[in-house]
Amino acid sequence: GKGSPILLIHDMLPGGSGYEWGKIEDDLALEHTVYNLDLPGCGRSEKSGITYTNFVYVQAICDFIKNVIGKKTDVIVNGYAVSFVVMACHNEKDLFNKIMMVNPVSLSSLKQMPGKKEKLLRRCLEIPVFGTLVYHMVVSRDAVNNEFIENYAFDPFHPDRDLQDAYYEAAHRGGCYAKNVYANKASKYMNIDITRGLKEIDNSLYIVEGEAENNGEAIVEAYKNVNPSVEAVMIKETKHFPHVEAPEQFLEQVGIFF
């Protein structure tokens, strides 16, 4: 597209990828240069045996803006990945313009650090055959469909089949390293307390919350308590993917904010 850059960053659910922005990226491209990034270890990006921590993603996002976009950019980010963008912006605020956060994850959950149980979980998932078997149970066709029905779709009877397929496919791409991102996230190695970062950044921040998102209202309140300049809007009849379930209303909010 043409116009000011806008960077889209997907959630970190097992099988997450830039595919989730498919329903809005063409419309965004009418007024912006759109960059749809698959984060390291996700989607079509390379999957490797490294420990995926918050810092790895902060670095990847900053490098992408510096080397590919080459100027200050607006960002739309979904779910858990909000934590990466907040920290990246806190570290290098000259790279970021406005930030739209879609259903950000709760601040309290990000404060949880790996304990003995989590370290054991990660070790188990790293065992070659056993770990891969467990991971394949987590991202089996039934498990992915159930996640959508229970946690992501507003209407459990009509989840977005194409998105489900994309999640299933991306979760299985990358051979034995496909499980790595999941192993590090499930064992809390990706967590980082973003409270200070959120408090100290003075960029325009806008939360878009799905009406039925679990704990949505409480999460928005917590973000506003830390940084009172945060604005928020709720999109009716949506849950975890408002940009998939109600693309028109979502684009309307993008138009208002950017």
Regions found by a protein language model. Give the residues of each.
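Short glycine-enriched nucleophile-adjacent loop
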Residues: 82-93, 99
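Conserved alpha/beta-hydrolase "nucleophile elbow" surrounding the catalytic nucleophile
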Residues: 10, 77-82
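Flexible "cap/lid" loop of the alpha/beta hydrolase fold
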Residues: 90, 98-132
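Conserved loop-alpha-helix segment in the C-terminal half of the alpha/beta-hydrolase fold
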Residues: 200-238
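Catalytic active-site module of serine/aspartate enzymes centered on a nucleophile-bearing elbow/loop
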Residues: 228-258
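Active-site loop/oxyanion-hole signature of alpha/beta-hydrolase fold enzymes
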Residues: 22, 36-76, 251-252
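Conserved alpha/beta-hydrolase catalytic His-Asp/Glu region
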Residues: 110-111, 136-199
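Conserved HGGG/HGGXW glycine-rich cap/lid loop of the alpha/beta-hydrolase fold
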Residues: 1-44
